[in-house]
């Protein structure tokens, strides 16, 4: 169960003793929560299956036999209190984390989806009828996050999933193999975020960066790795305990903390690499990882121990970067978007509550017009 992430209780409007416990399975209580029984559901890999994990629930106030549940794969509808289900497949509710493209013609779009793996599909097609579902290919399993083609040969590429899992895949055979960085020594336990930082080197197609509490680099497409940074997080032991106030442990890696969320190598200068963490640290190297500077105190208005969700190194100036931070996990839904033009010596907040409503997750600077930012 994941009370820190998702779990809801719903009450039947006709019967206050009937409660629904909404998390991975769905269970119901008929005695005000003293006991719960599972609601039968067909697994998602079978015809008309209902996809966990469940995040939303609605009971028809006029008919308690009719309810709708929402999860990582869409919605499920029942008219007979869960005895049978309808799973509508025409609602576009896929949740993408990261997107990339290759250089094929037509070029392909790649994306990692919440609890639905990593996929690729054509951006357009030469055939009549448009882009069909069957044109999309499943590449790497698990919770899909980063996925990026190998531009030397788009048959191959890289995909990430939960717990820091990193794979190199083969589109033709469907096979993929783990290339996750190993522990640097027997006494060092790596801390990978649920959505661990990944970046390709814009100067070398064989080089990749991956983040635990360290920045890891490979120069041979994942065959070997080396650590090029110290621990860039606060490394607070109190945030790394297996027990958090008595809450039921998820035991899936989603509770990992003090980890790197963002890595951004500069497309202008190969020695410049930015990194951001889930505990509010902003770090920079200007010598390819030999030395790192903590820039956190230079970012005025940065909430303490917030999530540095994304850093984008500018394609126009080596010292410029954009940074997205969010703090909604602490009830702060303000958008935090910062920009530096001097290697992090000073930062300007580019978006606030007067310009953008809701917290921010990502930023993109236009590749042609530097003043156009999304």
Regions found by a protein language model. Name each.
Residues 1-374:
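Beta-propeller blade termini and top-face loops
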